[in-house]
């Protein structure tokens, strides 16, 4: 089994949530907030809330869509916000631009709703990320499997979801390392196809482990070919 020159380093992560100074009582306010809030706020209400959504049974996976639905009573806008797939974004700037575009277009199409007061205000919050190296590295596929099975939900989310922003690539930490360091391109691609919206963190991890186990069995089979019986 291949040994990576650069081991995979698992990180543990925690998020500190801070309520900002901005809030929105209608769609015009929300647009101003989206244009002016910090990158940490956009991250909190999209990438970070997806982690919490994995433990819920209903509602949208980003806060802007959920507020548009539940508080502003604008179902069509909520669906347009929710249609923005965070897997398509490698920068907060690009995600912010599309959030603003969706809202501007909606306000232009339905100006009568732009200043209609919502049932409750939207409060812009920020997620401050604190990371520390986990006491576990992986140089082989076996060690990698052990690490993935061991890390917390927050760590799994950090490596599998939010890593796109850090790498500025449309992939995740796990797939990036498997392809680049172990040469397991097919495994990396299959892992990256795991849907972060239809799976919980637990089911996404379980699917990943099954894919890794299948790769390990394939390696064991190729390393121990059936020997012909002596005649």
Positions of predicted regions on the chain:
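Terminal, compositionally biased segments used for targeting/anchoring and flexible tails
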Residues: 1-231
